[in-house]
Amino acid sequence: MKQLLHTPEGVRDIYKDECARKLALTNRLHKVLHLYGYHDIQTPTFEFFDVFRKEIGTIPSKELYKFFDREGNTLVLRPDMTPQIARVAATLLGEHEFPARLCYVGNTFINHSSYQGRLRESTQIGAEFLGLDSVDADAEMLALVVDCLKKAGLEEFQINVGNVDFFQSLMEDAHVDEETEIRLRELIANRNYFGMDELLTEAEVKRSTREALSALSELVGGVEILEQAKRIAPSSKALKAVKRLEAIYEVLKAYNVSDYISFDLSMCGTYGYYTGIIFRGYTFGTGDAIVKGGRYDQLVEKFGRTMPSIGFAIVIDDLMNALQRQKIRIPHGQKNTLIIYDEGRQKDAVLLAREFRSKDKNTELLMKEEDRSVEFYIDYGKRTLAGGLLYLQNTSQIRMFNLQTGEQKIIKSRD
């Protein structure tokens, strides 16, 4: 019985005002994506396991929701939309359709450990720019993220930008084995630089590389830190990565969004498919990034086609939590009109409701129970966020109540 009445851990029901606010927020963001010329795409909720296998670079297999179809194929609830978009780009889109701007809204499913207390099903809205490797494409993505968050109502937020190529150059210069590199990535991602120094010493990494990796803690801030990054760049690849960030920043000034941009050269990415710039968006009221994105120039190739690409995803649920904690209201405009009627006025009430609905007015219809007062229905209307209440009485009068101002008036109904 317990499992019959409760949802599994990590999923939840969303209804009434919260659901209306979530849909309104999603629609706002969707509109911004369309303003930038992005076209909608829908992908399946589940895919073959191969789409999210380890070699793709997405989340670990143990965090996937896996099941079998009747033929014995292993299927997976999507944990991430990007590999699906890559599959579509490689298999369905023709050469004449690139560069392609695609956007989506959908739920993703990740089997987080129970102790993390995180949602296992979340709603994402995102955009993917396929077929173009350029500073302009990178800058457009970042500008689009900023415009989306501003449209959501946020005023204080920050987009941290890094470059995987810079970080990877340091790893290559360290000459460590795969296991040590994975551990280093974890330590740096968690800002545990003491643990990193200890591990580098144990691995007998040369002093110059240790110093460069230790300097990552200082390579966080405004555009000025890029000069420092160029001084410790261990290779031409790393230097090119920093210069790319400088060029992107110049374009972002033209978009008038550079004030929201900071740099973090220690970013290495949660997913293994990132290849160039990587970015995350942060604001008050949520512990994790509300936006994650970056360039994945080699991902589509794993599905059989070479294609540079960049994209991002906004986690709607986390964004809503941040807005709520910052006391930023999400107007949704879903104000119903509540019509109640005495039993003898049913036909009139139905006709009036039909007239309202024909004019795109949300209308709820209830027959008044004899043992319930009008005040009961007024309270009900306020709880359901109705804007007004009309009471059709057997006396041929209509009592009108403005549930927002408390104003009342009586009119004679039409014959």
Where are these regions (language model features)?
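Charged, compositionally biased N-terminal leader segments and the immediate start
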Residues: 1-6, 171, 176-183
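Acidic, His- and aromatic-enriched active-site or binding-groove loops in soluble protein domains
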Residues: 63-69, 176-197, 257
